[in-house]
Amino acid sequence: MDFHKDILRIDCKSEVKRICSFIQQQVRALRREGILIGLSGGVDSAVSAAICVKALGKDKVFGLILPEKESNPVSSEYATKQAKELDIETETIDITPTLEAFGTYQKRDKVIREVFPEYDDGYKSKITLPADLLSRDAYNFFTLRIADGKGNIKSARLGKKTLNGIVAATDSKHRTRMMHLYYYAEMKKYLVCGTTNKTEIIQGFFVKYGDGGVDIEPLRHLYKTQVYQLAEYIGVINEIMERAPSPDTFSFQVSDEEFYFRIPYATLDLLLYAWEYNIPLKRVCETMNLTEEQVKRVTRDFAAKYNATKHLRQLPPTLE
């Protein structure tokens, strides 16, 4: 199979047409009257919304903007600006009260205080994986980092129980958003449009029954860098194009690369393609100017994440 640095270049005009046809077919097949989409202020939701408008028209696409008190303020700002560019109707709902009622922040903070007893409302927190996978080998252990707002940062490696507690609480943000999306979708008899791309799907970078709980996934076949190609072609606003991708679920801001992927998307996607299609190691090294050890290190990371997240990509098992 062929492999070169431009292997992921796509014909954007044809791809948009193909995705539009898919969206139209699904709306008809499922007898819905339009599309409902969560707008995060990121590139995936911006591209998805824009293509939905091309497929169905602006009057058949409704956007929900669902910030909470720890969201980056620019997320809502950019989502609103993109929606205005598309001329679609939106509604903004602060989900903080729902999260507080469930105990999202309290449950997470209780776990954090087991590591850092001083942690209170004046602090911010995030979790990250070891940086720069290409430069050094490291296990996928998560580190908790807290900032006191005075320039002081502390960090500690997380054990399994502590990590699970933080992730379980944080993932409730995604699941709360999906609850709101489906409420409005059922009211309007609309489909919920997902925004997860192929890079995220393969590596398990989504939340089961959260952002992964949708009716259609029009970007699931595209790597993240291909989504950016479509974004440029469609004319997504510059603020979103230039923004570093982020899960935007932690009070202490963190990028996708810091939190999970450990290498830039441009490198990640090419290596992921090579791993997925079993491109010979020597060819990958020559094309990307990497050593065999670097490529092996990254593919070990791919395999570990893929295997650990298989359940996210599967339907619930049944007897028959």
Task: Show which residues each predicted segment covers.
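Acidic, Mg2+-coordinating phosphoryl-transfer loop and its flanking beta/alpha structural elements
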Residues: 67
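Conserved G/P- and acidic residue-centered "switch" motifs that form tight phosphate/ATP-binding loops
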Residues: 42
